A protein has these predicted regions:
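Histidine/acidic-residue-rich, glycine-tolerant segments that coordinate divalent metal ions
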Residues: 1-108, 118
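Metal-dependent amide/peptide-bond hydrolase catalytic core
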Residues: 69, 73-294
Length: 294
């Protein structure tokens, strides 16, 4: 179903009790590796802040203007200073969704910014969200504007289930990994040539210990093609991964486990155009069908 970090479709389904009474929920996510996912995820909250000020001629009557765009910028600066005083696992992201207009010679009377806060547990995310709210109020006070906030969505952290992970791994071992045609491998190799160095994804998340990460990286380096065609060994841990998923909300209502199936080349950066380009390829379709079989 649609939505993961943004949209949060399964969170709204969880709100309505859709997952209660299920024996288990099994899911997958496209990736550059074939593996059983372990560990928890960050919870997150998305909130839209809309500032309203007073328009004025930026040169002729600047003293009469009250800039909503200034308020957004001051909020962003305030959150920047907050980052020093957050948990190491916490994250705060933003996107300015409305800068007011295209004319710089006007004091912008409106501006909006969308914020996402993340932390390892819901209670921590709620606490961090309250601090961001105060910064928004402070920005409005400094600029003599008003601010309205709108809750967009929120996601819970994931409850790990090692028993289901072991079941999925046995199935994955028995089925094997997807196979690819020479044309599919050539496409993956060409796509891998569009990113390098700092663009490459690290490949192994923070939920793994150092020895496992080193082994996984060595296996990837020996793959021979950009597509990883092996199953990573089962690793089970309880550490967190910094991303967020609405699968977390499912996991609080029924036992839940997840796998990764290789759908794009090794090291492909997350949330990139390269990720998107694989979604309608045979490689991406194979990954989805293979996940269903597992």
């Amino acid at each position: 179903c649609p939505g993961e970090e943004g949209g949060a479709a399964k969170a709204f389904m969880a709100r309505d009790g859709l997952w209660y009474g299920l024996d288990a929920a099994l899911t997958w996510h496209p990736d550059d590796a074939n593996e059983v996912l372990t560990g928890s995820s960050n919870s997150c909250i998305q909130t839209q802040y809309h500032f309203t000020g007073v328009a004025a001629h930026a040169a002729g009557d600047p003293d009469r203007g009250r800039s909503a765009l200034d308020a957004v910028e001051l909020m962003n600066v305030g959150v920047q200073f907050l980052r020093e005083h957050m948990s190491d696992k916490a994250r705060v992201h933003y996107a300015i969704t409305d800068a007011g207009g295209r004319s710089p010679n006007v004091v912008q009377p409106r501006a909006s910014v969308l914020y996402m806060v993340r932390s390892n547990h819901v209670a921590e995310a709620v606490e961090l969200q309250a601090r961001v709210d105060k910064i928004a109020q402070g920005a409005a006070l400094m600029t003599e504007t008003t601010v309205e906030k709108k809750f967009i969505d929120g996601l819970a952290d994931t409850v790990t289930n090692h028993a289901l992970e072991r079941v999925l791994y046995r199935n994955f071992e028995a089925l094997g990994v997807p196979s690819y045609t020479p044309e599919e491998l050539a496409f993956a190799d060409s796509l891998a040539g569009t990113y390098s160095g700092s663009d490459r994804a690290p490949g192994v998340g923070s939920q793994y210990d150092l020895d496992y990460a080193a082994d996984a990286q060595a296996r990837r380096a020996q793959a021979g093609h950009a597509m990883n065609r092996f199953l990573l060994p089962l690793y089970q841990g309880d550490a967190f991964q910094p991303g967020s998923t609405d699968v977390g909300d499912v996991s609080w209502q029924c036992p839940t486990a997840q796998i990764h199936v290789a759908a794009w080349p090794n090291g492909c950066p997350g949330h990139s155009w390269q990720n998107v380009s694989c979604g309608r390829t045979d490689t991406g379709h194979k990954a989805a069908l293979h996940a269903g079989k597992v």
